[in-house]
Amino acid sequence: MAWALLLLTLLTQGTGSWAQSALTQPASVSGSPGQSITISCTGTSSDVGGYNYVSWYQQHPGKAPKLMIYEVSNRPSGVSNRFSGSKSGNTASLTISGLQAEDEADYYCSSYTSSSTLHS
């Protein structure tokens, strides 16, 4: 079972925004049913490292993205506790424990940024 990991692109104007930052995720992460995996999301002190506003989304093919984690480690109501978020320095992580077949999806991270630079 493998996941293609894509960067969520959120573009807005101005300084202090949910702008697209150069967040780096691994190209793919794989695991077997029952195992745990961790997906990293590395930014800078202007985004991931500077604010506790990292979110994670899950997207199945043909479906809208689903918010899984917000503000680094909070789960919305209805999201399984098999999903957990954390942050250390400029890197945020999403851990999925007890992998299940339905966890196969694209996972996206996003972060608030204080940078006024928009990356294309």
Curated annotation (Swiss-Prot):
In-chain residues carrying the UniProt-annotated modification Pyrrolidone carboxylic acid: Q20
GO molecular function, one term: antigen binding
Residue pairs linked by disulfide bridges in the UniProt entry: C41-C109
Main location: secreted
Signal peptide span: 1-19
Cellular component GO terms held in the UniProt record: extracellular exosome; extracellular region; immunoglobulin complex; plasma membrane
Region Framework-3: start-end pairs: 74-109
Annotated Gene3D superfamilies: Immunoglobulins
Quaternary structure annotation from Swiss-Prot or TrEMBL: Immunoglobulins are composed of two identical heavy chains and two identical light chains; disulfide-linked.
Protein name: Immunoglobulin lambda variable 2-14
Organism: Homo sapiens (Human)
Chain's gene name: IGLV2-14
